[in-house]
Curated annotation (Swiss-Prot):
GO CC terms in record: cytosolic large ribosomal subunit
Protein name per UniProt: Large ribosomal subunit protein bL35
Source superkingdom: Bacteria
Family: Belongs to the bacterial ribosomal protein bL35 family.
Gene Ontology terms for molecular function: structural constituent of ribosome
Gene3D superfamilies noted in UniProt: 4.10.410.60
Positions of the UniProt region annotated as Disordered: 1-22, 34-64
Compositional bias annotation for Basic and acidic residues: 34-48
InterPro entries associated with the record: Ribosomal_bL35, Ribosomal_bL35-like, Ribosomal_bL35_CS, Ribosomal_bL35_sf
Compositional bias ranges of the Polar residues kind: 50-64
UniProt-listed SUPFAM superfamilies: L35p-like
Name of the gene: rpmI
């Protein structure tokens, strides 16, 4: 049986932490900032955990 391949799109978008949680970046933080409030762009900083409903699906894409 061939080796299972990691979904390349998912590997670029999600990271697994040391404890096994899956984190992602928030959307709407790439461009067109001139009409977005500074408070919104600060809120969209950093990483956040993948919701519990999506964790199993993302895990399968990452060969978890």
């Amino acid at each position: 049986m061939p080796k299972a391949k990691t979904h390349s799109g998912a590997s670029k978008r999600f990271r697994r932490t040391g404890t096994g949680k899956i984190v992602r970046q928030k959307a709407n933080r790439r461009h067109l900032f001139e009409h977005k409030p500074s408070t919104r762009t600060r809120r969209l900083d950093g990483h956040t955990r993948v919701s519990a409903n999506d964790t199993q699906r993302v895990n399968s894409l990452l060969n978890g």
